[in-house]
């Protein structure tokens, strides 16, 4: 099979599109023919050298994987040839206390796909059945590649960690990015009032067309908390969703009302943020870190995408051969939602959706 291998990380990463052996199916696993794989900021951070710890040499990146089952192990149950499926974000043993407690994404034996073990920037991938979620036949595999991440990741952050409920106010920063644009939809589906911010004027209309709530341009010098308090009758937000990280950390904190929660995810660069601790103390506020998604979050995301509650946002489909162009586009910050890669030969040119 053909696979895209990261040969050298750095400001200008180097890749090789190489021919390697097809993967073999495990006793209790499947081989998935990869139809689409999203490019996550995690992938970008490995490409540019920011993330190094635990990264496999000559790694095949990609953890946002959707495809079709083309081989099934003799002990594999609940899935058959031709079924559509998405992978989890990490491997897991399925047997330890952590896995049995529903926290398989924290399995001590886990390896991140496209990080500690090879991922989906290839024509095929072999995974165990417990690291796979079956899709409905009618589902589009391009959009489905975003189900585990970013959609499942935002489901975990908002449903489980923040416990968003109907009538609450949720502020979403970075709402034009992969995490933000789906978090806004998840929050809206939970009945929350969504206030979304983006720094990109060209994303405003497209965000508004998704119909999840109010969208504002975060211009230089604007304090978003002034707007948030004006829109919430001076109560402040119940939740601030912050996938941007340190750059808006203090601003997001100021948006919170009493007992508010800020969930932070996405940023892995290790940047520091200056914070007025009193802003947290006198709000009885909470700051929650979040990463990953479990089977139940991915299954929830599948149901919401299948029913049309959440729309996967794909800016462009690009062939493996255009990985450097995809990298540059994502680094520019101009991508709305995600770029999805298509295995070599299945797509010969970039297509906007």
Give, region by region, the residue ranges found by the protein language model.
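Residues located in well-ordered beta-strands
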Residues: 2, 33, 66-68, 193, ...
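Short Gly/Pro-enriched turn/cap motifs at secondary-structure boundaries
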Residues: 21-22, 56-62, 113-117, 123, ...
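Glycine-rich beta-strand-centered segment in the early N-terminal region that forms part
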Residues: 22-37, 50-97, 136-139
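Short, surface-exposed secondary-structure boundary micro-motifs
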Residues: 35-37, 74, 90, 104, ...
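NAD(P)H dinucleotide-binding glycine-rich loop of Rossmann-like/cofactor-binding domains
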Residues: 93-174
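Mid-domain Rossmann-like dinucleotide-binding core that forms the NAD(H)/NADP(H) cofactor-binding site
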Residues: 139-221
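Glycine-rich cofactor phosphate-binding loops and adjacent beta1-alpha1 units
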Residues: 162, 195, 205-288, 346-353
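C-terminal hydrophobic helical "lid"/dimerization subdomain
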Residues: 250-253, 295-353
């Amino acid at each position: 099979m053909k696979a895209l291998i990261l040969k050298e990380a750095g400001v200008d990463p180097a890749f090789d599109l190489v021919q390697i052996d097809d993967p073999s199916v495990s006793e209790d696993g499947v081989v998935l023919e990869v139809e689409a794989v999203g490019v996550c900021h995690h992938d970008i951070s490995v490409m540019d050298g920011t993330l190094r710890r635990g990264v496999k040499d000559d790694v095949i990146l990609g953890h946002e994987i959707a495809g079709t089952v083309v081989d099934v192990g003799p002990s594999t149950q609940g899935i058959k040839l031709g079924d559509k499926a998405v992978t989890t974000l990490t491997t897991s043993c399925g047997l330890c206390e952590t896995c049995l407690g529903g926290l398989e994404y924290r399995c001590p034996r886990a390896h991140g796909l496209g990080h500690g073990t090879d991922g989906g920037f290839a024509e095929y991938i072999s995974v165990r059945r417990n690291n796979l979620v079956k899709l409905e036949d009618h589902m589009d595999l391009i959009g489905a590649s975003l189900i585990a991440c970013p959609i499942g990741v935002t489901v975990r952050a908002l449903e489980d960690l923040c416990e968003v409920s109907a009538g609450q106010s949720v502020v979403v920063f970075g709402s034009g990015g992969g995490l933000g644009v789906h978090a806004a939809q998840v929050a809206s589906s939970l009945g929350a009032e969504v206030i979304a911010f983006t720094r990109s004027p060209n994303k405003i209309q497209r965000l508004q067309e998704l119909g999840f709530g109010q969208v504002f341009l975060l211009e230089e010098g604007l304090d978003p908390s002034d707007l948030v308090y004006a829109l919430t009758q001076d109560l402040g937000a119940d939740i601030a969703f912050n996938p941007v990280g340190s750059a808006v950390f203090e601003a997001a904190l100021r948006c919170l009302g009493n007992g508010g929660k800020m969930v932070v995810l996405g940023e892995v660069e290790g940047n520091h943020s200056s914070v007025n601790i009193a802003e947290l103390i006198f709000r009885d506020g909470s700051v929650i870190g979040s990463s990953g998604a479990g089977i139940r979050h991915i299954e929830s995301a599948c149901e919401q995408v299948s029913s049309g509650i959440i729309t996967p946002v794909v800016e462009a489909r690009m062939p493996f051969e255009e990985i450097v162009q995809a990298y540059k586009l994502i680094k520019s910050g101009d991508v709305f939602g995600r770029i999805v890669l298509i295995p070599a030969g299945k797509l010969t040119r970039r297509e906007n959706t």
